[in-house]
Amino acid sequence: MDFGHILKSLVGMAKSDIEKKVEQQQTMSDRIVVDAVEVVEPFDFPPVDPGSIITLEKPAHFRLKMKRFTQLGSGNKRWYDAIMDVRFDKGFKTNGTSAPKIFNLQVPAYIAMTEKNANIYNAAAFIHDGLYACKGEIEEEGVPNAKNSKRRYTLSRIECDNILSEIWRKSDFVDSLTAKIGELGVNLFAGGEEHWDNDDLHCKTSFSAKIKYLK
């Protein structure tokens, strides 16, 4: 398969066509928009070659201000404001493989920590890898219209992919169209059993995510 040709074809598609494909896929689906990314505790790892396994030498913590379109309780689907706290323990490992390799030239899995906004950009693939390894399982707090306001919940693959491209956009390292192309590539090429619920690097025990809904 000529992956280079596939990449060029996708990049060459009109912006409206890309947006239409993603919109069609997400129609009536739960989805997430990230408004801001706060670096609470930055990443700390030594320089590595592309494709190598990264091991965090210190804990890291990121906070996402977000909107989530979903159904909570017995109400209809609507947008909810929320904060998502994502924590990585020391020793968390990732190689960015939940994002397809054919897009690495256009949207690299991670960038050198010396680059501008590297923490935010790298958080995209790191969080995505963690969510995929956990099969989207997170904690929820402050759940409206629910008897128990705290619970375990599973994000859909589309929501996890939303988070990936939304953080890419917030990093300003790639433009909105390129981020959307990257998300489409994840939808098309990285969605099977090979990555979803794949914890080959044993990062489930060193990754956690919690969404807190705002009143």
Identify what each model region corresponds to:
Residues 2-215:
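Extended terminal accessory/targeting regions
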